[in-house]
Structures are given as C-alpha cells and as structure tokens.
UniProtKB/Swiss-Prot annotation:
Tissues in which the protein is found: Highly expressed in lung.
Record topological domains on the Extracellular side: 41-76, 172-208
Bilayer-crossing regions: 21-40, 77-99, 149-171, 209-231
Cytoplasmic topological domain residue ranges: 1-20, 100-148, 232-333
Binding partners and assembly: A connexon is composed of a hexamer of connexins.
Region (Disordered): 292-333
ATP-binding as UniProt keyword: no
Function: One gap junction consists of a cluster of closely packed pairs of transmembrane channels, the connexons, through which materials of low MW diffuse from one cell to a neighboring cell.
Protein name: Gap junction alpha-4 protein
KW Protein transport (keyword) present: no
Keywords assigned by UniProt, alphabetized: Cell junction, Cell membrane, Gap junction, Membrane, Transmembrane, Transmembrane helix
Record organism: Mus musculus (Mouse)
Length: 333
C-alpha cells in the first residue's frame, strides 16, 4: 500500500462541498475501505503468491497456474477500484477550486473598479458584467459554494460516474474471482505435464475479507443511488418553490398598490317600470302650465290703464320699462 495522505486531504476538501449523503459516502470510503484495506489487507494477502503451492516439480508450472488463478491480485484490484471511483470526486473538487478562485478574482476586480474616482459608461458596463458573472456563482454566508447551476451539473455527473464505475468493478470482481476463495485450484496449462492441483493459503479468512469488501462496495453503490434521488428531489423542490414565488409576486404587487381599485354602483337614469310619474297641476305638464301663466299675465296687463309717462324725466334717466312679451316668454319657457 502506498501513502494515501494526499488523497485523503483532497477528499476531505470535497466533504465541505458535498451533500449529507455524499459525506456518508466519503466516510464509508475512508473508514471501511482505505483504512481497513491498509491495515489488514497486507497481512491477509501478503502470502498470496509465496504460499501458493502446486503438486508438481515442473519448473514454471506453479507460476503459470498462479497467473491463471489470479490474473490480478485482490489488493491491486481494490486499489484500482478506489482510484477510479474517487476520480469523479476529484474532478468535482477541481471545479469547486476553479469557481472559488474565479469568485475571488471577480471580487478583486470589482473592488478596483469601484475604487476609481470617475466612473464612465465603460466602467458601469464592466461592473454590470462582473455582477452578472458573480450571480452565476452562488456563495453561502460562510464562504462555501452552493451546489447550483454548473456546479450542480458537475456534481450530478460525478455521482453518475461513481455509480457506473462501482457497479462495473463489482461485476468485474464477480467475473474474475467470484464471491468465495476456493482452497483448491485445478490447473491444466502448459508447461504443466498434466492436470495439477494447487492450494491457496488461508482460504476462509480471504473469503471473509472478500465478502466484507463486497458488502462495502454494495453500500457505496446504494449511497450513490440515494444521492442521485436526493439531488433530483432537491432540484424539483427548488423549481416548485421558484414557480410559487414567481406566481406570488403579482398578487403582492396589487396588494401594496397605494390606489386600490374601487367598485362603484351605477343606477339607471331612465324611469323604471315601477317608478311613479311626475305630479302635474290640473292635468297639465310643466311647460303647458308656464304658457298658461304667461297668457293670463298678458290679459291682466292689457286690461289696466296706461301709466303716467313724464315727457321730460329728471336727471336724464328713463324709468325702467316692463319687459316685453318675448322676454317674458323666454323667462317662463
């Protein structure tokens, strides 16, 4: 086993930008895979080739049978599995680091532009472009990047790749070795002169270790699938919330209108069928009554004697004359 310190540090940084299920997956990867394999793997599989014995004295037959029984060592196969399964996570970590550095550069550039004493149109456009780019990088209050936008796409792709690689390595282990370690391996391969029986050391202990690593691999695969479901539900809930907020904005705007719309009731101007007619005097309408009053007044005026008229009025003023009949008609009509 090599030094896993560098890989552990990288995956520890990924844990800060992962979901709850992703953190559990990292815990399973560290404790139940890397540490146990590093501590117990060498002691269990260290004598794999040295204690592989065959009942023949033919030179080279034991090595050929060992190559047929174990095309690749279990330890090396699991190491390759860890490296391949961890690679998508490392790619996601690279995306996180890239976005973090980009966000820092944008903030630094924004500070330099805002510090300028005079701001022309080009500076305002540059600030607007920087704000638009920073809006795509969602940063939490504690400084961590939120899994949204392009980062969400990278995270989903990494989880999918981990699931496919995990399932592929589990299938490959089953095709190469099976799920148990047989104590006797029958070999018939040149340069062996005949069918040779070869014996494996501590087969029961190795079988237990194989089953343990198999269970851990299945748990890791299930966690990856659960994380995909978690991400899908998270995206759907966020989309539903965004639609609700979008639908609620017009209602809130109408409620805060300082001049709300009022409802007025309009009564018909015409007379309804149940409204009583206007009262009349002596069966006459108002216009006919006015004409009758005017005619009566003219008759009374013609029957009176004419008033005394001064030929030379004092002060040069004329006495006001009575309005003529046309003016009276206009008055009463």
């Amino acid at each position: 086993m090599g030094d896993w310190g560098f890989l552990e540090k990288l995956l520890d940084q990924v844990q800060e930008h992962s979901t709850v299920v992703g953190k559990i997956w990292l815990t399973v990867l560290f404790i139940f895979r890397i540490l146990i394999l590093g501590l117990a793997g060498e002691s269990v599989w260290g004598d794999e080739q040295s204690d592989f014995e065959c009942n023949t004295a033919q030179p080279g037959c034991t090595n050929v049978c060992y190559d047929q029984a174990f095309p690749i060592s279990h330890i090396r196969y699991w190491v390759l599995q860890f490296l391949f399964v961890s690679t998508p996570t490392l790619i996601y970590l690279g995306h996180v680091i890239y976005l973090s550095r980009r966000e820092e550069r944008l903030r630094q550039k924004e500070g330099e532009l805002r510090a300028l004493p005079s701001k022309d149109l080009h500076v305002e456009r540059a600030l607007a472009a920087i704000e638009h780019q920073m809006a795509k990088i969602s940063v939490a209050e504690d400084g961590r990047l939120r899994i949204r936008g392009a980062l969400m796409g990278t995270y989903v792709v990494s989880v999918l790749c981990k699931s496919v690689l995990e399932a592929g390595f589990l299938y490959g282990q089953w095709r190469l070795y099976g799920w148990t370690m047989e104590p006797v391996f029958v070999c018939q391969r040149a340069p062996c002169p005949h069918i040779v029986d070869c014996y494996v050391s501590r087969p029961t202990e190795k079988t237990i270790f194989i089953i343990f690593m198999l269970v851990v691999g299945v748990i890791s695969l299930v966690l990856n699938l659960l994380e995909l479901v978690h991400l899908l539900c998270r995206c759907v809930s966020r989309e539903i919330k965004a639609r609700r907020d979008h639908d609620a904005r017009p209602a809130q705007g109408s409620a805060s209108d300082p001049y709300p719309e009022q409802v007025f009731f309009y009564l018909p101007m015409g007379e309804g069928p149940s409204s009583p007619p206007c009262p009349t005097y002596n069966g006459l309408s108002s216009t006919e009554q006015n004409w009758a009053n005017l005619t009566t007044e003219e008759r009374l005026t013609s029957s009176r004697p004419p008033p005394f008229v001064n030929t030379a009025p004092q002060g040069g003023r004329k006495s006001p004359s009575r309005p003529n009949s046309s003016a009276s008609k206009k008055q009463y009509v």
